[in-house]
Structures are given as structure tokens and as C-alpha cells.
């Protein structure tokens, strides 16, 4: 398995160069590996746990699957969503009842990929830079989402561009995303394929500013 640690070993020379030039403000956004998976946790800035579960992301096809951990909290329903960002389609899946809700997604930016117009803010060490295996070098990116009257901040590993954390600040809500145990593989590529019972389901109406961030709420 290719973990954050392995990626940092493989790209150690490149990272050393990057660290030495971290003061350069016009650094171009890095690109996520083609496949990533792991655990994603979302909380509100008020400290409320909104969702926690397994994510899978295909950066080449721009497809994302998130299945909430049913043991995470005492809820009556749990999130299982599949998003095809390129096509602008969002599926809300209920595997227990074999039902599916399909919506259009007009706004297609999200926090699994750094937007091309993001600004490189800084490169920092989390933990200790001098003690072996006691630190992680990250790059911080930020930018605006004018269509949503919002702005964001993203942290990725310097070695490999893996997601570490992200913040979204909007008019309706503020969200904080954390990523754990990130791998550069997906166990089952079929997670990006809608279940058969989603076929033929009509699109439900959604507002023009409907976005990935609307999935997470109290």
C-alpha cells in the first residue's frame, strides 16, 4: 500500500527542493493522485460532528463516493453519496431499501481537488521537523468560491498532494474537513458506478447553487 509515509520517501528529493523554495508565492496547485481512499470527517466550526466515514476519489474521472460510518452517531439515516462532478450528477443512495435520489450539480468544485485558481499560502511542518517520523510537511492553499459567496482553505501533503484538511466558510455554513489513513488506491472501482436501481430514476429539482457542501448539515 502506498501511504503518506511511502510517498514522502519516494519524493524526498523533490520535497527538499520544494521546501527550500517554499517562499515562492506563485506555486501552481498540485494534483491529487489518480486514486485515493481513506476516512473523512466533517464537523461544523461550532464543533458539531456532521459526518464521518469512508471516502473514495478518482481524480482522473472526477468521481467521489462517501459512505458514512453507521456506528459514528445515533442517527436514523446515514449518508451514502456518489458524485460524478464532470457530469454534474449527484446520487443519494439507500442500499438498505434499494432506492436512489438523483440531482443535478451545477456547482462542481469540491475539496478533494485543489481548484486551478487556488493561491499557495505557505508550506509548514505539523509536528516536529527535526525528529524522525514526528512531523508532516504540508502545503496550505486558499481561494474564493464567488458563486457560493464563500472561501476555502486546503492543506495537502508536500509529498504526493494527499488531502490533510480543509475549511469552507460560506454564508449558510462553515465546515471543517479532516482526512485520515489516506491511501493511493481504491479497493473496489465499482464504488464509482451507480447501483442498478438508480437506472431510470428521474432528476429531482435542485437550486442553481447546489453544491458538494450542501451534503453536510446539522
Swiss-Prot record:
It is found in: Secreted. GO terms for molecular function: calcium ion binding. It comes from the Eukaryota. PROSITE patterns: EPENDYMIN_1 (PS00898), EPENDYMIN_2 (PS00899). The keyword Magnesium does not apply. It holds the Pfam family Ependymin. The keyword Glycoprotein applies. Residues 1-20 form the signal peptide. Keywords: Calcium, Disulfide bond, Glycoprotein, Secreted, Signal. Glycans are attached at residues 74, 97. One of its GO terms (biological process) is cell-matrix adhesion. Binds calcium through the terminal sialic acids. One of its GO terms (cellular component) is lysosome. Belongs to the ependymin family. Forms disulfide-linked dimers. May play a role in neural plasticity. May be involved during axon regeneration. This is Ependymin. It comes from Devario aequipinnatus (Giant danio). The gene is epd.
Amino acid at each position: 500500500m502506498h501511504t503518506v509515509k511511502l510517498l514522502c520517501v519516494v519524493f524526498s528529493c523533490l520535497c527538499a527542493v520544494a521546501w527550500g523554495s517554499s517562499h515562492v508565492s506563485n506555486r501552481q496547485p498540485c494534483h491529487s493522485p489518480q486514486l485515493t481512499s481513506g476516512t473523512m470527517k466533517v464537523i461544523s466550526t461550532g464543533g458539531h460532528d456532521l459526518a464521518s466515514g469512508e471516502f473514495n476519489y478518482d481524480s482522473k474521472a472526477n468521481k467521489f463516493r462517501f459512505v458514512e460510518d453507521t456506528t459514528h452517531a445515533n442517527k436514523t439515516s446515514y449518508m451514502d453519496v456518489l458524485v460524478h462532478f464532470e457530469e454534474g450528477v449527484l446520487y443519494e443512495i439507500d442500499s438498505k431499501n434499494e432506492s436512489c435520489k438523483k440531482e443535478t450539480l451545477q456547482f462542481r468544485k469540491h475539496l478533494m481537488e485543489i481548484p486551478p485558481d487556488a493561491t499557495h499560502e505557505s508550506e509548514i511542518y505539523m509536528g516536529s521537523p527535526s525528529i524522525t517520523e514526528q512531523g508532516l510537511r504540508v502545503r496550505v492553499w486558499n481561494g474564493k468560491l464567488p458563486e457560493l459567496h464563500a472561501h476555502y482553505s486546503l492543506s495537502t501533503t508536500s509529498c504526493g498532494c494527499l488531502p490533510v484538511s480543509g475549511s469552507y466558510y460560506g454564508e449558510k455554513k462553515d465546515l471543517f474537513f479532516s482526512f485520515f489513513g489516506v491511501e493511493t488506491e481504491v479497493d473496489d472501482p465499482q464504488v464509482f458506478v451507480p447501483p442498478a436501481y438508480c437506472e431510470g430514476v428521474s432528476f429531482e429539482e435542485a437550486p442553481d447553487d447546489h453544491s458538494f457542501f450542501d451534503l453536510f448539515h446539522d
